[in-house]
């Protein structure tokens, strides 16, 4: 059972209450789908994945750094606000992940991402947890047959473990750096994503509360 006390022990903010966790209905949905597909033999398994997008810009991400005593570090910067975006989805338990570098955050790119995730796991049914961005609820969103969307409560990014993956990517590839071109941003993003070790991802996204959701009430 997920108790109010256990939520405090897990360092979850007080505003993230047990009611908000239960509103996700992840546990009941996951087990209902798993049972149904096992009986129907229509999908191999149900994958629970957390989805989000992040923007990466040519401007330097200023952060603290080491420097010789008595000297002030100099960091290159500029004012070119050109972005590339990255869509991502990750399983918080197995750390299986999927990423798509995109030209924007909108319905068109979300449709492209959903199609590619669907094609990456054609024999599985994917329960995709995401935030309430307007393009996630567009009337023209095309949801593949093997994907189902569920949404975290508004203003609760801490309930989406993939948020920590973006922090790790920025720390590895975008801290105190300026990029001459958008192509350089894309290259660095690809390099960092491909270099993310499974053990690092596991420690980054693993949350005890995500496991508690599946314990018996």
Residue ranges, per PLM feature:
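Short functional hotspots at interaction and active-site rims
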Residues: 1-217
């Amino acid at each position: 059972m997920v108790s109010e006390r256990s939520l405090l022990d897990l360092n979850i903010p007080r505003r993230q209450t047990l009611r908000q966790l239960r509103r996700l209905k992840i546990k009941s949905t996951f087990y209902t789908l798993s049972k149904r597909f096992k009986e129907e033999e229509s999908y191999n398994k149900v994958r629970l994945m957390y989805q989000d997008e992040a923007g990466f810009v040519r401007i330097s991400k200023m952060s603290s750094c080491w420097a010789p005593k008595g000297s002030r570090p100099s960091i290159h910067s500029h004012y070119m606000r050109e972005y590339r975006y990255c869509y991502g989805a990750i399983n918080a338990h197995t750390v299986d992940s999927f990423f798509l570098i995109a030209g924007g955050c909108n319905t068109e790119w979300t449709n492209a991402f959903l199609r590619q995730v669907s094609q990456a796991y054609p024999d599985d049914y994917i329960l995709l947890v995401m935030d309430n961005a307007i393009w996630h609820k567009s009337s023209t969103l095309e949801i593949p047959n093997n994907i189902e969307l569920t949404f975290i409560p508004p203003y609760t990014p801490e309930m989406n473990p993939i948020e920590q993956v973006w922090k790790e990517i920025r720390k590895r590839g975008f801290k105190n750096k300026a990029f001459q071109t958008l192509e350089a941003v894309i290259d660095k993003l690809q390099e960092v994503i491909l270099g993310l070790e499974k053990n690092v991802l596991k420690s980054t996204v693993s949350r005890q509360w995500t496991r508690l959701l599946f314990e018996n009430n």
